[in-house]
Curated annotation (Swiss-Prot):
Phosphorylated by sty1. The modification Phosphoserine is found at residues 37, 41, 49, 86, 141, 397, 401, 427, 435, 456, 466. It comes from Schizosaccharomyces pombe (strain 972 / ATCC 24843). SUPFAM superfamilies: RNA-binding domain, RBD (SSF54928). Residues 34-62, 164-192 have a biased composition (Polar residues). Residues 76-88, 141-160 have a biased composition (Low complexity). Residues 16-63, 76-97, 138-199, 457-490 are annotated as: Disordered. This is RNA-binding post-transcriptional regulator cip1. Interacts with csx1.
Length: 490
């Protein structure tokens, strides 16, 4: 038949013989008969499928030619009988397209190491397909050379005994499903490895948790299993949605290891839990995370300080949006941090301007500074100094009213104004504190004279401490004090 009918067919120069045969090439009637039949067209079988390469003899006996799993593509042939090949046909390997020529030639070619291999046409519906599949499942080794030669003798080109018996073939799907179930059971029951260097020995990750399972319910399973409960157990939410992931922390590595071995593979609501050790981040990543945490903490601290600062000054009645108040605060801030090379800073205002006086008082208390006033007519100078460079001759604090400050002694004014400012009052009271114009020593001396008489220890101490005082002055003062209290002189 010309090659134009089959364009895919290999074109061969018919004038030359194959395999060194100088004789005229004869057509392969068996191969042509198979190709001409539309029902017996060759089909490619998948790689790895068990094929029973078996032909039956006239007596009905069968034996496997190659009962192992075929690792290459094989051509499926039909059950139709084909004419017997001639002895003069050239052979390719241990078989021809139509099968073995005879027992002796097939045996010799099967054992030949220098032969060229060709695809083997196997029958898909052979009688012994079940035997070949069973041998393939049990990893039966291929027959030896002697066995193959004896088996090849029983083969013939006739189509007797080629009835299909596909009902006896074992199910591959059932076998694969059994292997998958066994493998999954072995993996779930396998003991996990101990924590490595890149893991945290006291932290674990629980995966594949049912989405509807609550955290308290999962902790109840810890109690039922008798395993240690973590001191920290948190569900992980991705954008507010639970994805079946949780983190647990323990005090000791032994507790974590017991939980991993017990809880791994544990089934809850039809889902098997997977427990793993929590991995550490690389050193570079950990450093980045720590820096980010420090930066966030610093930002939160600054915001909190600004919030407290704003609330405190708002309660005191100060408005930092005011230009004058903001300028006063800026100057005091620079002076408090010693950014201004000066021992003191001065503010000038009128005695009737209470806003500036109130602002300086509050800012000085906030920055821990001292201030005092220098009146000059209607102009009032407020001098602010550092605590270690204060002027001891003048009061350290200044009330809102400048006239009040100069009517009181310095120590008493300082104490009164400090207590007054701590109570939260913005301005000094209208009524000044009582003035101690009369010395206390006279009152105490009169009381001592009433008790001890002339032998008063206070009188003796005052007499010794003041040698320049005359005796007459002392007697006069003593008699005056005694008369005031109604004490007679003995």
């Amino acid at each position: 038949m010309p090659n134009e009918i089959f364009p895919w067919k290999i074109r061969v120069d018919e004038s030359r013989g194959l395999a060194g045969n100088s004789g005229t090439k004869k057509s392969n009637h068996e191969a042509l008969s198979r190709l001409q039949s539309p029902l017996n067209s060759p089909k490619l079988q998948p790689i790895g499928s068990p094929q029973a390469s078996r032909k039956t003899s006239g007596s009905g006996s069968s034996a496997p030619l190659y009962p192992k799993w075929s690792g290459a593509l094989s051509l499926a042939s039909s059950r139709a009988a084909s004419p017997a090949p001639s002895d003069s046909f050239p052979t390719f390997g241990y078989s021809q397209l139509g099968g073995l020529e005879n027992s002796s030639k097939g045996s010799a070619l099967f054992n030949s190491a220098n032969s060229i291999g060709t695809p083997y046409l196997s029958s898909r519906n052979s009688n012994s397909a079940n035997e070949a599949s069973a041998m393939a499942f049990h990893n039966v080794s291929p027959p030896s050379g002697a066995e193959s030669s004896s088996e090849s003798k029983s083969f013939s080109a006739s189509g007797k005994g080629n009835k299909a018996d596909t009902s006896a073939e074992p199910s591959l799907d059932a076998f694969n499903s059994t292997q998958i179930k066994a493998g999954s059971t072995a993996n779930s029951n396998s003991t996990p490895v101990e924590p490595g260097e890149d893991t945290i020995p006291t932290a674990i990750v629980v995966k594949n948790i049912p989405f509807s399972l609550e955290k308290d319910t999962l902790l109840d399973h810890f109690k039922q299993l008798g395993i240690p409960r973590p001191y920290a157990f948190n569900y992980h939410y991705d954008n507010g949605i639970f994805r079946g992931l949780a983190f647990a922390n323990f005090y000791r590595p032994e507790e974590a290891q017991v939980v991993v071995q017990t809880l791994n593979g544990y089934e809850i609501n039809g889902r098997r839990l997977r427990v793993e050790w929590k991995r550490q981040l690389p050193a570079a990543e950990r450093e980045k995370v720590e820096k980010a945490k420090k930066r966030q903490a610093e930002e939160r601290r600054r915001k909190q300080q600004y919030k407290m600062f704003e609330v405190s000054f708002t309660d005191q009645g100060l408005n930092l949006n005011d230009t004058g108040t903001l300028e006063t605060y800026s100057r005091l801030l620079l002076f408090a941090h010693q950014c201004i090379p000066s021992r003191e800073i001065t503010f000038e205002t009128t005695s009737k301007d209470g806003n500036l006086l109130n602002a300086i008082r509050i800012f000085c208390l906030y920055f821990d500074l001292d201030y005092y006033a220098r009146p000059n007519g209607e102009v009032l100078k407020l001098v602010v100094t550092h605590p270690n460079k204060k002027n001891t001759s003048v009061s350290q604090s200044q009330p809102a009213s400048p006239n009040l400050r100069f009517n009181m002694p310095a120590p008493l004014a300082t104490r009164f104004l400090q207590e007054h400012s701590l109570n939260g009052t913005k301005s000094a009271p209208i009524t000044p504190p009582p003035s101690f114009a009369v010395p206390l020593t006279n009152q105490l001396r009169s009381i001592d004279d009433k008790i001890y008489g002339n032998e008063s220890p206070l009188q003796k101490a005052s007499t010794l401490s003041s040698p320049f005082n005359s005796k007459n002055d002392n007697d006069a003062s003593t008699s005056a004090s005694k008369q005031s209290f109604g004490v007679s002189h003995f």
